[in-house]
């Protein structure tokens, strides 16, 4: 009788991938990167084990949004003080904080517990085409579509 393979945390081999965000749509890029961080692209995927790979995203400032989202989409945060609600448009976020914009989209697609926080630590987002992870010899990952 065959049994289902369950990966052990010490058996997981991690790779490093580079994804170029230039000209890509935010949500489509985020969903594929979230799947890589979870490890769903591997045949040894196990839901309760962090078996994902490291992902480096470059050119974060060149991410695209469809429709009128650049001006209509709003990002909210609160300082936890009365009247402390801060609001930014997607255009402000892309101009000033493109890393946060991508991180926020991807974090929302990961599991919400301790395992999700562990997976999120394997995401590295940078403006421009330079990154400090050359020593890890990352492979270029081509996104679908």
Swiss-Prot record:
Protein name: Large ribosomal subunit protein uL13
Cellular component, GO annotation: cytosolic large ribosomal subunit
Assigned protein family: Belongs to the universal ribosomal protein uL13 family.
Keywords, in A-Z order: Ribonucleoprotein, Ribosomal protein
Assembly and binders: Part of the 50S ribosomal subunit.
Domain of life: Bacteria
Record function comment: This protein is one of the early assembly proteins of the 50S ribosomal subunit, although it is not seen to bind rRNA by itself. It is important during the early stages of 50S assembly.
HAMAP family for this protein: Ribosomal_uL13 (MF_01366)
Species this protein is from: Geobacillus sp. (strain WCH70)
Any one GO biological process: negative regulation of translation
InterPro entries registered for this protein in UniProt: Ribosomal_uL13, Ribosomal_uL13_bac-type, Ribosomal_uL13_CS, Ribosomal_uL13_sf
Entry's Gene Ontology molecular function annotations: mRNA binding; structural constituent of ribosome
